[in-house]
């Protein structure tokens, strides 16, 4: 869509049936579902699981914020504000906001289904008192944004015009909960993540909210009892592949390669988390037997 000398990308809606011809997706989906189920099972039997989930959230906050350029260590994230050097407090606040936003959103899922209202509430908490707080926290954008480059003229990617954001986000919300389509949850989540990052509905914080949406979806739909799966570490370790895979959907309409990449990330990350929980149980058992 061309306006004012630039061309924004207008994604198609997603709330409909999806099928695929790529058999690799079936195998990857099976692997990812198995790993996710094992992760969930371990999270139900590990004693003091909430303490480990808390540390999981801190690590995710640090990694997800690091992708955006925030430099705070996990050790610093656990300190109180008055223990942080003044020049590092902005970065520290961004990470603490992320932790608060995850915890608030998960608690809200007990009362509300996953919704755009909850997404906006989470965004408002994420942006509270930090860089970007003047960029409409808690509200979908009312102006054009862009990704990469210093302006609209040299941007790598220009998300849809602001006038289309409410309808696109309403379509996304309907897709989260549409029980009349036979789309497996992890494939649905892959499509959701692509679509959210493509809409880029906020002026700031889209990457963090997009990554945070994943555990919310999994907990909200009963695939996880605890928010124990976070993909930021996988995305950061494969950063170039991550951005390339998203852009290939936009440029070549190749959604299958993105779904494959996403399912690999879920399988790897859930498998790592499962192994950590298994080690915790093993150590606990050895300790009790001594």
Across the structure, where does each feature detected by a protein language model lie?
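FIC/Doc superfamily catalytic core
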Residues: 1-290
């Amino acid at each position: 869509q061309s306006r004012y000398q630039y061309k924004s990308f207008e994604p198609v809606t997603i709330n409909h049936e999806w099928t695929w011809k790529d058999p690799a997706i079936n195998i990857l989906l099976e692997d990812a579902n198995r790993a996710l189920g094992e992760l969930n099972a371990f999270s139900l039997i590990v004693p003091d699981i909430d303490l480990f989930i808390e540390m999981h959230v801190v690590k995710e906050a640090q990694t997800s914020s690091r992708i955006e350029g925030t430099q705070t260590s996990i050790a610093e994230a656990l300190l109180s504000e008055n223990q942080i050097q003044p020049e590092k407090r902005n970065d520290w606040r961004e990470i603490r906001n992320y932790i608060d936003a995850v915890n608030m959103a998960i608690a809200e899922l007990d009362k509300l289904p996953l919704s755009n209202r909850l997404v906006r509430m989470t965004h408002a908490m994420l942006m509270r008192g930090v860089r970007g707080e003047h960029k409409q926290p808690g509200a979908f954008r009312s102006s054009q944004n862009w990704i990469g480059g210093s302006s609209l003229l040299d941007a790598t990617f220009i998300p849809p015009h602001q006038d289309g954001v409410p309808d696109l986000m309403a379509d996304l919300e309907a897709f989260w909960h549409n029980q009349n389509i036979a789309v497996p949850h992890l494939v649905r989540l892959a499509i959701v993540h692509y679509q959210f990052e493509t809409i880029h509905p906020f002026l700031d914080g889209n990457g963090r909210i997009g990554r945070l949406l994943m555990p919310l979806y999994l907990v909200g739909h009963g695939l996880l009892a605890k928010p124990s799966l976070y993909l930021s570490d996988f995305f950061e370790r494969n950063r170039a592949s991550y951005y390339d895979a998203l852009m290939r959907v936009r440029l070549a309409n190749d959604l299958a390669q993105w779904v494959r990449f996403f399912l690999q990330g879920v399988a790897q990350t859930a498998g790592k988390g499962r192994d950590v929980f298994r080690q915790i149980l093993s150590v606990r058992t050895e300790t009790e037997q001594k």
